[in-house]
Amino acid sequence: MLLEVRDLHVEFRTRDGVAKAVNGVSYSVDEGETLAVLGESGSGKSVTAQAIMGILDIPPGKITGGEILFQGTDLLGLKEDERRKIRGAKMAMIFQDALSSLNPVLSVGAQIGELFTVHRGMSRKDAKAKAVELMDRVRIPAAKERVGQYPHQFSGGMRQRIMIAMALALEPDLIIADEPTTALDVTVQAQVMELLADLQRELRMGLILITHDLGVVADVADKIAVMYAGRIVETAPVREIYKAPAHPYTKGLLESIPRLDQKGRELYAIKGLPPNLMHIPPGCAFNPRCPLAQDVCRTDVPPLFEVSPTRRSACYFWKETLDA
């Protein structure tokens, strides 16, 4: 197994109290596999990714339990200099806001090339040639002419391709893409997702795709983990999720996607708001918003029930959800 996250717990200590951002998250990604992690803002999906990468803000963040096994090594037991050697070379991350992630006063070629000068000891000339090669690989037109340009001279979609090029530079075994299509036009979103999928297949990387949009993962992911209030509430192969969700939250996410084949249908919206992570409701955190909630949901935290050999749902009424 390439990556295994086991019972991970992360909290943030603030003046107002302790926010439990990640509560017992477990998932895995193998070589050549794509896992989509879905959930609303504040669900813990990005915090989990930051913990995997070792870029969590500590303090106020703190990993309070669990294991993160990468190629059999527990990353949480490594020193910072050992983590740094893995970061970039073995695993890399694509952030959601390319403009703020790129240095505005350095050319894109210099920023891509820096990975080779720092990690591979290349000369600047050779690093620039590698930068051009990578820009070609991520389908940036006229890469040789544009390698000296600055981030503001590229469109949003092209900047995101530069971020992908930087993530691919050292040919890592795992890439984490955190909302890589945020703020992009729908057509550009599709192009970026297609590019990621093509590169993942070509290089046999593991890919974790973090998103709140079920619509962008249908043709890319192999399996899905749905998160809510710091917990995983459903995991399944992507086709099973789309065919029939086994958790009311997943069902709500699917029904809230606009569809062209259902003209005149009122667009569904999940009632209420995600909980305050400093005051998570007792029992199932989704119970105040759930149409199926019963007394047991308000008192007992549901485990991940086995729906099938490849599927789990943290809902006492997963059978009713499937049949609904």
Whereabouts are the PLM-identified features?
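ABC ATPase NBD Q-loop/coupling interface
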Residues: 13, 67-85, 123, 194, ...
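P-loop NTP-binding/switch modules centered on Walker-like glycine-rich loops
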Residues: 40, 176-180, 184-265
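Conserved ABC ATPase "signature" region
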Residues: 67-74, 126-145, 254-255
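Short catalytic/signature loops enriched in Gly
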Residues: 141-145, 235-324
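A short, proline-enriched helix->beta-strand linker immediately N-terminal to the Walker B motif
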Residues: 169-173
